[in-house]
Amino acid sequence: MKFAVIVFPGSNCDVDMFHAIKDELGEEVDYVWHDTENLDEYDAILLPGGFSYGDYLRCGAISRFANAMKAVQKAAEQGKPILGVCNGFQILVESGLLPGALIRNENLKFMCRTVQLRVENNETMFTSQYEKDEIINIPIAHGEGNYYCDEATLKQLEENNQIAFRYVENPNGSVSDIAGIVNEKGNVLGMMPHPERAVDELLGGAEGLKVFQSILKQWRETYVVNA
């Protein structure tokens, strides 16, 4: 399986994402600069965290216009797995690939610590290796991670089982404790916590690795078993 890590000016979690795929998952991965127009050779697309374009205007508001995002949109329409973490989640929301918005944390402070998440839906291509309601420890590092949506959108997310992760103890004011959501099709996941920073027991825990293992399992079942 071949992954692409999209790198924007100001990305700073791309190396962590690359390490998670190459060294922990053992799969092929490339850094792909934001001006690329073709992602057809890749099986999965990863949008890392950071401060793309300095977070000017709004987090992710400029990155949404990058050439690569047109290719990401195409990949999403093709059903390829798209994972956006932290700033990557913000870019997915700004691009319209996921509903809602990410606003300033309720306490107006940047927060960097490990939090507990509850797996709300383990039937997605990103969460199949978890148990439903499993509690996992994943780091956060954000100042604008407060997920917001209106009541109608929240109702739709709940009815369609699009909420992938919730905070056990809400750190930022996110509506309904939401930490991560998928699109209606189920192939685009955005989450504020950083699973790529929790892939090695020697570095504090590996409870985020199952996100990437789930993607790999889905791909193998679809393209290898049926080959």
From Swiss-Prot:
It is found in: Cytoplasm. Pathway: Purine metabolism; IMP biosynthesis via de novo pathway; 5-amino-1-(5-phospho-D-ribosyl)imidazole from N(2)-formyl-N(1)-(5-phospho-D-ribosyl)glycinamide: step 1/2. GO terms for cellular component: cytoplasm. Pfam families: GATase_5. Residues 3-225 form the Glutamine amidotransferase type-1 domain. GO terms for biological process: 'de novo' IMP biosynthetic process. Keywords: ATP-binding, Cytoplasm, Glutamine amidotransferase, Hydrolase, Ligase, Nucleotide-binding, Purine biosynthesis. It comes from the Bacteria. SUPFAM superfamilies: Class I glutamine amidotransferase-like. GO terms for molecular function: ATP binding; glutaminase activity; phosphoribosylformylglycinamidine synthase activity. The keyword Lipid biosynthesis does not apply. Its main location: cytoplasm. Its EC number is 6.3.5.3, 3.5.1.2. It catalyses: N(2)-formyl-N(1)-(5-phospho-beta-D-ribosyl)glycinamide + L-glutamine + ATP + H2O = 2-formamido-N(1)-(5-O-phospho-beta-D-ribosyl)acetamidine + L-glutamate + ADP + phosphate + H(+); L-glutamine + H2O = L-glutamate + NH4(+). The keyword Cell membrane does not apply. The active site is at 86 (nucleophile), 194, 196. InterPro entries: Class_I_gatase-like, PRibForGlyAmidine_synth_PurQ. Part of the phosphoribosylformylglycinamidine synthase complex involved in the purines biosynthetic pathway. Catalyzes the ATP-dependent conversion of formylglycinamide ribonucleotide (FGAR) and glutamine to yield formylglycinamidine ribonucleotide (FGAM) and glutamate. The FGAM synthase complex is composed of three subunits. PurQ produces an ammonia molecule by converting glutamine to glutamate. PurL transfers the ammonia molecule to FGAR to form FGAM in an ATP-dependent manner. PANTHER family: PHOSPHORIBOSYLFORMYLGLYCINAMIDINE SYNTHASE SUBUNIT PURQ. Part of the FGAM synthase complex composed of 1 PurL, 1 PurQ and 2 PurS subunits. This is Phosphoribosylformylglycinamidine synthase subunit PurQ. The gene is purQ.
